[in-house]
Regions:
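Gly/serine-rich nucleotide phosphate-binding loop at the start of the catalytic core
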Residues: 1-55
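Conserved NAD+-utilizing ADP-ribose enzyme module
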Residues: 2-8, 44-103, 107-209
C-alpha cells in the first residue's frame, strides 16, 4: 500500500480512551501498554504478569503519580487455550508482548462508535482523539503498522488466526482498508491531532482541544 492509497482508504483516524487520557497524552504522548507497565508502581512479579498474560479486566496503574487505565483484553478469553489460535510457533506470552508494544487507532468511525458506546455504558465518559491520516504517516514513519483483523478478537473458526506478521508496515500491506492502524513504540509527536473531545453517556460532548 502506498501513502496515497492509505489516505484514500482511511479518511478517519481516531483513538478512544478513558476520561483523562487526553491530559496524559498531552504530557507524555501516546504511550504503549508496555511503556506504561514498565514505568508503573508495581512489584516485579506484577510487572512480568502484565507484560506476558492477557488482561481479563481493565487494570488501574499508577504511573508518575497519575492514575492510568489499561483496557481489558477480554475477547482473548473466548478460547480456553489461547495458543490454539496462534500460528508461527507463537505462545500466549509472545502474542501479548506484540500487542503491548503498540498504540492502536481506529480507521473508521463505525467501529470506533461501537467501542465508544460499550465503554460509555460502563464508565459514563470517554475521551476521543481525532488525527490527520496524512500527518500521522509523516509523524510515525516506518513505525506505522496496519492489521487486517481486530488483534484482540477471536473468530468462530478453527485453526491459527494470530500470526507473527499480523502487523504489517505500510509498504507491505495490500491495497485494502485496514482494520487497525498501530504505531510501534508509541508516538511523542502530537502534531497529527486536530481535535480531542470528551463524550458522555447522556450525549454531552466537551471539546478538549
Amino acid at each position: 500500500m502506498t501513502p496515497e492509497q492509505f489516505l484514500h482508504r482511511c479518511k478517519v483516524i481516531c483513538h478512544v480512551g478513558p476520561v483523562g487520557v487526553w491530559e496524559q497524552i498531552t504530557k507524555h504522548g501516546f504511550r504503549t501498554a508496555e511503556q506504561l507497565i514498565l514505568e508503573a508502581d508495581l512489584t516485579e512479579e506484577e510487572r512480568q504478569a502484565l507484560l506476558s498474560t492477557p488482561r481479563r479486566e481493565s487494570v488501574r496503574l499508577s504511573v508518575r503519580g497519575d492514575a492510568v487505565t489499561l483496557r481489558d483484553q477480554g475477547p482473548l478469553f473466548a478460547r480456553k487455550d489461547l495458543k490454539s489460535i496462534l500460528g508461527d510457533g507463537l505462545d500466549a506470552s509472545d502474542w501479548i508482548h506484540l500487542l503491548n508494544q503498540r498504540v492502536y487507532f481506529f480507521t473508521d468511525e463505525t467501529s470506533m462508535r461501537k467501542l465508544l458506546d460499550k465503554y460509555l455504558q460502563i464508565d459514563g465518559g470517554q475521551d476521543v482523539i481525532w488525527l490527520s491520516p496524512l500527518k500521522l504517516i509523516e509523524a510515525a514513519g516506518l513505525r506505522l503498522e496496519l492489521t487486517s483483523q481486530n488483534t484482540v478478537t477471536i473468530a468462530r473458526q478453527s485453526g491459527a488466526q494470530k500470526m507473527a506478521d499480523a502487523f504489517a508496515p505500510l509498504w507491505r500491506f495490500t491495497d485494502r482498508k485496514p482494520t487497525e492502524a498501530t504505531i510501534l513504540g508509541g508516538l511523542d509527536d502530537l502534531s497529527p491531532v486536530f481535535r480531542a473531545e470528551r463524550c458522555f453517556q447522556d450525549g454531552r460532548r466537551q471539546i478538549l482541544t
